[in-house]
Every structure is written in structure tokens, then in C-alpha cells.
Amino acid sequence: MATMTYTTLTQDLKDWMENDGTEFSNETDNFISLAEQRISRDIDPYAFHESATSSFNTSDRFVSKPSDAKIIFHFIWLDSDSKRIFLEERTDEYIYDYWPTSSSTGNPKYWANYSDTALLVAPTPNSSYTIEISYARRLAELSSSNTTNWLTQNAQDLLLYACLME
């Protein structure tokens, strides 16, 4: 089977739908995007699992999320002896209630999703410990400039079928 690309997928959609019209062609990017989003929600292949390493900023209760993170699995920090300490996930309300004064510091115990770009920890870190975040990454979206991704290389039939369903 030949490798699927953005170009071959858009042509396959036109062929399967027997529609070469401008209106249909203008919507193919939308069909592809919706199909990728659906697949990304419905499956969680190991190939999408990533790990990122960073460090706490002393006296800052916020940590930047990896830019491609969809779901956080684990949040770990390494103490001075390189012992891995897993933080427990909580809600941001819990963290604000547990550690209301952000200027007070300590060894972090909890984390919460704060926004699309940040995580919240408590207690506020008292040192710039190394951190590891395990997560499911977002799928790289297909486009005319990004012509292949995991789906075109590993699940061509699934991607085509999902696009046709849209």
C-alpha cells in the first residue's frame, strides 16, 4: 500500500465522493480536521505518549504545560537525591484551599490543570527541582505544509473512513 499524504487523502476524498466541485474541495480541510479530532478523542495509541523534562521556578506555583499536551498522565519531581516523587492530581479549587498563600513555599504535593498552557502546584515550590511530565500529545494536523502524520503512516484506512463520515 502506498503511503498516504495530505494530497493523496484529499484526492481520495474527491474520488470516493465522486465530487470534484469547488464547494466540496473547499471543505476537505475541514473534513480532515474534524476526522483527526474525532480519532484523537476516541483512541489513545501508545505512539501519542510523550514525556517532557523541565524545572520548577522557585516561589512560582505555576508550571508551563508542554505545548502539545492533550492529557497529563503523571507529574513527577526529583528531590536532591534524584528520588522521583509523584504529585497527586487535584482540582484548582482544592489547591487554592489547601495552599491559599502562594508566597509560602514547601515541597510540592499536588497539581491541577489551571489553563490550556499552565499547571498549578501546591505547596509553591521552595526550590528549582527537576520535573517530569508524562502526557498524551495532540496529533500533528495534516495540511498542505504538513503532509503526513501518525495516522497517514499507521492508520490510513481509519483516517479515510473518518473523513468520509464527516
Which residue stretches match the model-derived regions?
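Glycine-enriched, solvent-exposed interface loops adjoining structured elements
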Residues: 1-166
